[in-house]
Amino acid sequence: MLRLLEEKIATPLGPLWVVCDEQFRLRAIEWEQYRDRMEQLLNIHYRHEGYERVSATNPGGLSDKLADYFAGNLAVIDTLETATGGTPFQREVWQALRAIPCGQVMHYGQLAAQLGRPGAARAVGAANGANPISIVVPCHRVIGRNGTLTGYAGGVQRKEWLLRHEGYLLL
């Protein structure tokens, strides 16, 4: 049975749930107000193998590392390991998201083209929306083709804050 360690941490944007496995690979990061979404994704991805969730304090130093990110050490999120469920296509999109440099953005069509699927912008958007590891798998760095801030499960205000925090200048 998969054992998931979880902790709720304080951030400038509100409480954030951090969930990892016993090897301290992130399995989920989600804002408190969207905890139901996180629980649905955990069930979708891990119910077949069975899992239990256990309260933990700073598992693997992950909570401290996320606090460091919010304090300005932006590069720390690139060092964090993830282990996600999802379809092969979703995992491919999530891996591509991690390659978008801090302070930069892409639109869904650019990301689809980068994956060799230029007609799959909507599918990329759907995979982006199913991302279980907010911030570390930086789905907030994907914007609409016309530059609008669209499609962040944590809310557009948080997306804007994260992009500004990372140095992306919004007009």
Curated annotation (Swiss-Prot):
GO terms for cellular component: cytoplasm. The keyword DNA repair applies. GO terms for molecular function: methylated-DNA-[protein]-cysteine S-methyltransferase activity. It catalyses: a 6-O-methyl-2'-deoxyguanosine in DNA + L-cysteinyl-[protein] = S-methyl-L-cysteinyl-[protein] + a 2'-deoxyguanosine in DNA; a 4-O-methyl-thymidine in DNA + L-cysteinyl-[protein] = a thymidine in DNA + S-methyl-L-cysteinyl-[protein]. Pfam families: DNA_binding_1, Methyltransf_1N. It comes from the Bacteria. Belongs to the MGMT family. Involved in the cellular defense against the biological effects of O6-methylguanine (O6-MeG) and O4-methylthymine (O4-MeT) in DNA. Repairs the methylated nucleobase in DNA by stoichiometrically transferring the methyl group to a cysteine residue in the enzyme. This is a suicide reaction: the enzyme is irreversibly inactivated. This enzyme catalyzes only one turnover and therefore is not strictly catalytic. According to one definition, an enzyme is a biocatalyst that acts repeatedly and over many reaction cycles. This is Methylated-DNA--protein-cysteine methyltransferase. It comes from Salmonella typhimurium (strain LT2 / SGSC1412 / ATCC 700720). The gene is ogt.
